[in-house]
Amino acid sequence: MRRLTRMAAFVAAGMLVLSVGASAGPTAGAGPPLRYLAGPPGTLDPAFIADAGDVQLLLQLYAGLTRLDERGEPYPSLASGWNISDDGLTYQFAIRENLEFSDGSALTAEDVRRSWLRLLDPATGATAPDVLSVVVGATDRMAGDSGDDDVGITAVDDTTLIVELRYPASYFLEIVATPATFVVPRAADATQGWQTLDAFVGSGPYVADATDGADLVLRANDRYVAGAPPIDEIRWVGSIDGGATAAFAAGEVDLAGVPGWDATWIAYDADLGPRLHAAEPLTISYFGFDTTQPPFDDPRVRRAFALALDRERLVPLAEGASSQAAGSIVPPAIWPDGFSPNLGADPEEARDLLDDAGYEVRADLGTIVVNGSGLGVEPAVAVWREELGVDMAVETMSFGNFLDLLDTRPPQIFTVNWIADYPSPHALYGLLLEPGAASNFGDWHDPEFETLLEAAAAAGESEIGGAYAAVEAYVSEQAPVIPWAYGETWWLVADGLRGLGNLTIGLLDFGRVSWDE
C-alpha cells in the first residue's frame, strides 16, 4: 500500500518551515555533496510507491507537468502552461519543446500519456493509480473494463496534451505534481525491474548513479527541464550507527529528521538548538473499520466508538507529547478557510448509540479485534472496554504482513498512518474514503458522501471552505474512520543549506536546494 508510513521511519512527513535558508529557486555553485539521512532506498519506479520514503526519492529522479513551490502551489515544470475550459472539465497542457530524458532521448506529450496509461493499466499492478481517478475512463481502465483509447488523455502532438475530467477538480494541477504521475522513459514496462542503476534513465533533477555501501548516490541531471541543480551530488544515506541526532552532531549527515522526544531537549542545546526546525504535520494516523461486516456496517456503532474517545487526553498518552489530537483525516496545514473539525467526546451518547443499534447486551458484539500495527492503541482500547463495556482484543504483526492483511481481509478495526499525496483535502477524502479507491481499506460506500465530495472538488475559492466543511460533517456523522493524531516532525539542518523553504507534505525538492557560496 502506497504512502502508508512506518512509525519508526527515518523521516516523517510534514511541511518544513525553516526560519533560515528559504529561497525562490536554485543558486549557482555546487559545493560539497548533500548527505541526507533518508533510510534505505526503495523503488526506482513511480508506479510502485510504497511509502513516504519512496515519494521523497522519486521526486528527485523524475518530473511531471507541474511541481510544488515553497507555499505548496503548483508551478510549470514539463508543461510551460495550461488552459482550463470554462466548465473545468478539460485541461490543455502546453508541453515544453526540446525536452529530454537524462539519456538525451526526446520527451514529448506522448511520453506523458504513455506514463499515465501505464499507471492505470491493471497489468502494471501500480500501487497508486487512483490519483488519476478523476480522469474520464480512468476508473474503468484500472478495473480492466476498458482500453487505453477510452481514457481521456490525448497527445495531440509533441507539445500538446489534453486531459478530460469526470467532474471539475480544482486540485488537478496539484495531482500532476505527485510522483506517481511523473514521466518515465519508453523502456518502462509492467515489471518492477526495468530500471537499474547501471542504465538509469529519468526525467528529474537527479539520476540514480550508484550505491556506496548502504548509501544511494544521486548525480545532477544536466538535461533536467530547469537546468542542472546547484548541488552536484546527493548522498541518500541508508543507515547509520546510532541515532539521527548523534549522526548529525558528529557531522556525518547534513539533513535529518528527528523524533519529537529528541526535539524536546535539542531545542535547549546551545549547538544543535539553532539548527532544529519544526515541520507542520501533513500526516494523519487513524482507526479504520471494516464497514462491510457487522457490527461496523452500522454507522451508529462506528459513531459510538468514535464518541467514546477523548482524543485530546488520549493521544499524548499513546503517541507522546509531540503528537496532536486529530479531529479530521485532513491535517491542519491544508484546512481551507472556515474548516473546523469537532474533537468532542461524549461517552454517554456513545452508549446510547450502541443501545439503539441493538447491542444493549454488549456481549452480542462478540470480541472486537483491533490490529495495532503502527499505533499505540492501548489507551483507546482501554476506553472502549471501560466506557462501552465491549470485550476487546489486540493483534499485532509485521508491517509487511499488515499490508497484505489490508488487501485481503481488513480487521474489524485497523490502524493506518498516512501521508497526503498533494496539498488538498481531496487527497485524504478521495483516496481514503471514495468507493473503489485502492486505499479505502474499510470498503466504505456512501452515495451522499460522493455527492458532497464532488461538489467540494468543483467549488470556487470562496466556497471551498464551506463545501469541505459539509464533507467533514458528514464523514464525522457516518464515522467510517476515527481520526487519531497528526504527527509533528522535526529536522536538523546543516548551516549554509539554502532553498528548503516551506516545502509542502515534507517533500524536499533538492533540485531547488543549494549551499551558501
Language-model segments: residues:
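N-terminal lobe/hinge region of extracytoplasmic solute-binding protein
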Residues: 37-86, 117, 201, 507
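Surface-exposed binding/hinge segments that line
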Residues: 94, 111, 120, 124-186
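Gly/Pro-rich hinge or "lid" segments in bacterial periplasmic/extracellular proteins
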Residues: 149, 154, 165-229, 233, ...
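Extracytoplasmic/peripheral linker and loop segments enriched in polar/acidic and small residues
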Residues: 154, 315, 390-407, 416, ...
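Ligand-site clamp/hinge motif
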Residues: 194, 214, 222-266
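Structural transition elements
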Residues: 324-357, 372, 376
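Ligand/substrate-recognition segments at binding pockets and active sites
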Residues: 355-420, 489
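Long beta-strand-rich cores associated with HINT superfamily self-processing modules
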Residues: 491-517
